[in-house]
Amino acid sequence: MKTPHRRYWVFFLLFLFTAIAYVDRVNMSVAGKPIAHEFGLSPIALGYLFSSFLWAYVLMMLPGGRLIDRWGSHVVASVATAIWSAAQMATGMVGSFATMLMARLGLGIGEAPFAPISYGSVRAWSPYTERGTAIAAISAGSSLGLALGAPVVAWLIETLSWRWSFIITGAVGFVWVLVWLALISTPEKTRWLPQAERELILASRDAGVEPPSHDGVGYRGLIRCPAMWGLFISQGCLVYTGYLYLSWLPNYLQTARHLSMLNSGIYTAIPFLVATATGIVANGAGDKLLTAEAVRAGKRRYLVALSLLFMAAGLAIPFVQSLAGVIALITIAVSAAHVGPAANGALVGDLLRSPGDAGRAFAFLVLGGNTFGLLAPIVTGYVVAATGSFNSAFAVAGALALVGAVAALALARGTLGEHPQPALARPRLAD
């Protein structure tokens, strides 16, 4: 008898969760030009505004991971989404640059547990053989949210105003919260989940992992693992490039390529639309090709490193004159920037030996990504102000991609969440 697949509805809701989060992020990027005009902002000030939600996002990341480990992803998801949706709506009602920064900080507080929620939910709801595909499918919500959000937000701005674009997109999040609260709990408690599927999930999600004899090693134990730092650095290099394009691509197309608001939204959509399919296909192939032994050995790091090498395509952008050529290179870089983080998230699950540390490990991974990511809009703003072009900004992102590939290959191996053996218990070498 074939096992049902109702768990996919959880992944679909998380896909929408991700899409909504990224529509709310790209809204500021598309609206950047009219906001800068209304408040008289320089490229440097605009860079700080683009980055501002990440300040709170990064600061609240580790506390968010602890909340997930304590209360569960399903509970934290609804509270976090309500907070960030309220902040998104408030952004459309501000009267000054200072109050806009405060609203963006509220968005960061709400979105801080967003990625650990997704990663933790996948680990709770999927067999290990589906882990990479599930995370890639959920992560595809980010690229699809950007692909659809950019032109829709551009249309809302041209049709109504930049203020209404924030109010409308923020309201969508509250609809998602109502659906999530009505349908989702844990696999053990969700009533609409067939018993056969429940047993499959519970029996196979920790396949190959010895049942832990402890509650976890906590943040202190995780940061002692070289693998955690390899994941941290590679995720940072991936997310830096992702935020460069998320924050500045519409503005780049409007100012450097002289496209209209609506056309900049349409061209921004192209790389992220392609990235939607690329992320699912590449990570799905990884799941198919990796054996259980390869998963436990951390072989998924090769997919992470390959993604980073493709992401370095951005180094060639300054040497290409045609708009079509630039969009093609950006599409390669953005697609790679969506394949890599999903693979890295699955790799954390592969290497983790203590389920009690799942929320903290995923939070630390995302902290690495966004520690680098919050710098991307600011660094780019200074570069554009100093040079009058985006060329050096693309070069910085390409160089970081190469650094990340080395970190993934050299460090992201071994295990996470194991207590070291006491010195007296270790076997002695023969004399």
Features from the language model and the residues they span:
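Cytoplasmic helix-loop-helix junction between adjacent transmembrane helices
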Residues: 103-143
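A late C-terminal transmembrane helix in Major Facilitator Superfamily
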Residues: 352-387
